[in-house]
């Protein structure tokens, strides 16, 4: 596991974008696993700027998003489908048929999960998976106590996650109670993983992910079992990492 500490959110976002750019340069038909939420927004902004400067070509890139709320249509402003197109896909030259996001209004949700796994396999698996992390250590919508072998599945969101996401809605009551998410087993199949975190509210989850014991209570600790993980965090998210452990960490200021 490689850990990079940056001075702030902006530098974290820039570093993450550079890693994605390098991946696509090396493999133009890269399969990216993508995340939503406020954390990767800066990375998407930098990738759009790189595209506009002619530094990156998304025309052969394939993407799979981690998750989607159940019950929200793709055009709902709080759906992750809407988020991705509004904040990223509409601003680059990606082919719409190469974009994959779980369908939260599918008639048969179990079948939707099975098909999503099939599509990932058909694409050759995920080359580079981008992750955020919840304050309780969840990745995707894999909440505490999930099996580390799960594939794409339907989850019931915890009150903690609902409260964390209510800022995107008018009230907590409007936050969907269920979602489709790629499972921990699906995520761990990615060839490379980059996890992003920013802010003091993520510091405890980051400390546990980097130095804690492997436990389903903190889903992100499973990343210690993956052979190619890079964690990029700002100083605030790194604030609880013990000083003696900082010697092993790359710090970018």
Curated annotation (Swiss-Prot):
GO cellular component labels: cytoplasm
Pathway: Amino-sugar metabolism; N-acetylneuraminate degradation; D-fructose 6-phosphate from N-acetylneuraminate: step 5/5
Active-site positions on this chain: 67 (proton acceptor), 136 (for ring-opening step), 138 (proton acceptor), 143 (for ring-opening step)
GO MF term set: glucosamine-6-phosphate deaminase activity; identical protein binding
Role, per record: Catalyzes the reversible isomerization-deamination of glucosamine 6-phosphate (GlcN6P) to form fructose 6-phosphate (Fru6P) and ammonium ion.
Family label: Belongs to the glucosamine/galactosamine-6-phosphate isomerase family. NagB subfamily.
Designated name of the protein: Glucosamine-6-phosphate deaminase
């Amino acid at each position: 596991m490689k850990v990079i500490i940056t001075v702030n959110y902006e530098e974290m976002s820039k570093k993450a974008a550079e890693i994605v750019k390098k991946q696509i340069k090396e493999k133009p038909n890269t399969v990216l696993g993508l995340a939503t939420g406020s954390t990767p927004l800066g990375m998407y902004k930098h990738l759009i700027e790189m595209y506009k400067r002619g530094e990156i070509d998304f025309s052969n890139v394939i993407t799979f998003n981690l998750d989607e709320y159940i019950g929200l249509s793709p055009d709902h402003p709080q759906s992750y489908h809407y988020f991705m197109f509004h904040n990223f896909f509409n601003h680059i030259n990606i082919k719409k048929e190469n974009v994959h996001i779980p369908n939260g209004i599918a008639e048969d949700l179990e079948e939707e999960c099975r098909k999503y796994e099939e599509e990932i396999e058909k694409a050759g698996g995920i080359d580079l998976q981008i992750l955020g992390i919840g304050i309780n250590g969840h990745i995707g919508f894999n909440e505490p106590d999930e099996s580390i072998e799960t594939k794409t599945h339907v989850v019931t969101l915890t009150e903690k996650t609902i409260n964390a996401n209510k800022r995107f809605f008018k009230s907590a009551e409007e936050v969907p109670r269920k979602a489709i998410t790629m499972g921990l087993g699906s995520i761990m199949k990615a060839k490379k993983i980059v996890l992003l975190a920013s802010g003091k509210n993520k510091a405890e989850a980051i400390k546990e992910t980097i130095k804690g014991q492997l436990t389903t209570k903190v889903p992100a600790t499973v990343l210690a079992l993956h052979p190619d993980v890079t964690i990029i965090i700002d100083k605030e998210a790194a604030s609880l990492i013990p000083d003696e452990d900082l010697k092993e960490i790359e710090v970018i200021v």
